[in-house]
Design a protein with these regions (language model features):
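Juxta-kinase regulatory segment immediately upstream of eukaryotic protein kinase catalytic domains
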Residues: 1-3
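ATP-binding glycine-rich loop module of kinase domains
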Residues: 10-36
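Short beta-strand micro-motifs within the conserved protein kinase catalytic domain, predominantly
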Residues: 55-68
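Conserved kinase catalytic-core helix
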Residues: 81-116
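An alpha-helical support segment within catalytic cores of ATP-dependent transferases
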Residues: 107-154, 158-165
C-alpha cells in the first residue's frame, strides 16, 4: 500500500483506505481469501447486470502481512449516511432516495450471484441452539418462499450508499 493513503473506515476485519483515484479494502488474516475473491466476483456480477457500483480492479495478497486487499474504482461523492447526518432537515428526502434505490436494485436479476436462500439454509443448519424440529420447520418456511434471481444487497444501509458528485446513487 502506498504511504499516501487516507483511512476512511475501520470495521471488524477490514480497514478501508482512499488512495486518491481508487479505494482499497484491506482485510486482516481472519477474512478467508475465498471471501475476498467472492466479494470481487459479486462486484463484477452486479456491475454486469447494470447496478451502479465501483468496479473491482484487483485482489492481491499484502506484502509483509497475513491479509488480502481488494482495490476498486473510487466513486467521487459522499455516503448517504454522512449526508443524512450533515443535513438532518433533508433526512426524509434522503430516506426516500434510499428506499427508491433499494426498489431499483430489487428490479435487477443476476442468476450467477450466490443465492441468499442457500446462505440462509446453511445458517439455519448451523444453529446448534435450536432443536432439529425447529431447524426443519425453518427450512420448510425457507423452501416455501418464492424462488427468484433478484439482486438483494446483503448489507444495505446508508453508509454503503454513495451519493456521487454526478447526483447518482451507487452501492
Amino acid at each position: 500500500l502506498p504511504d499516501s493513503k487516507t483511512e476512511l473506515v475501520r470495521r471488524g476485519n477490514k480497514v478501508v483506505y482512499d488512495l486518491g483515484d481508487k479505494i482499497v479494502k484491506v482485510f486482516n488474516e481472519t477474512k478467508p481469501v475465498s471471501d475476498v475473491f467472492n466479494e470481487a466476483l459479486n462486484l463484477a456480477r452486479i456491475n454486469e447486470c447494470g447496478i451502479r457500483s465501483p468496479k473491482a480492479l484487483e485482489v492481491s495478497q499484502l506484502e509483509n502481512a497475513n491479509g488480502w486487499a481488494l482495490v476498486t474504482e473510487k466513486v467521487p461523492g459522499t455516503t448517504l449516511a454522512e449526508k443524512m447526518t450533515a443535513e438532518p432537515q433533508r433526512f426524509g428526502e434522503y430516506l426516500e432516495m434510499f428506499v427508491d434505490l433499494q426498489i431499483e436494485i430489487h428490479g435487477y436479476t443476476s442468476p450467477l450471484l450466490n443465492r441468499q436462500r442457500d446462505k440462509y439454509a446453511r445458517m439455519i443448519d448451523s444453529l446448534d441452539q435450536l432443536n432439529a424440529t425447529t431447524r426443519y420447520n425453518l427450512q420448510e418456511r425457507l423452501d416455501g418462499m418464492t424462488k427468484e434471481f433478484k439482486v438483494c444487497h446483503g448489507d444495505f444501509n446508508p453508509s454503503n450508499v454513495i451519493v456521487g458528485d454526478d447526483g447518482q446513487l451507487y452501492v
